[in-house]
Amino acid sequence: MNTRDKIITHALNISCEIYNANKNNIISNNNRSSSTIKAKRMFIYYLYEYMEIKHTGMKKYIKDINHASSIHHVNKFHFELQTYEDVKKYFNTFLTEMKKFNVYGGGFYEKRKEIKKLLNELNKIKND
């Protein structure tokens, strides 16, 4: 298992812990209970927004999910994150746990943020 897969597996485990959901129900995509949907929604949002996995790539992690369902979950979670305090609190807990898991040693999120900043600067210079 490579580092990226370890991070993704940990993200799935943390989202399941937060919502008390069964990991296999999320992966197999065959359960519509509230806790499963909430955990799956958070997991998909994280994969899309933080791991930069495209909607069409979600099927690698969740069986038989199509890109439209992935888009729906990301948009719905984004709305809930902006609207509901409890979702915001749970997601902050999730992010804190993910940062603790830091398998890159020097801070994956910080490095990613720095790379994006440098890419933006390069694009700005290129366009000027």
Label each residue range with its predicted role.
Residues 107-128:
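Short, low-complexity, charged amphipathic interaction modules
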Residues 54-73:
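Short, basic interhelical loop/turn and adjoining N-cap
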Residues 48, 73-81:
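DNA major-groove recognition helix of helix-turn-helix
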Residues 1-14:
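N-terminal leader segment of winged-helix/HTH proteins
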Residues 81-107:
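Short Lys/Arg-enriched helix C-cap and helix-to-coil transition segments
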Residues 14-40, 65:
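Short, Lys/Arg-enriched anionic-surface-contact patches
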Residues 37-53:
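Short, amphipathic alpha-helical "recognition" segments used to contact nucleic acids or chromatin
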Residues 16, 48, 59-60:
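Residue-level preference for well-ordered alpha-helical positions
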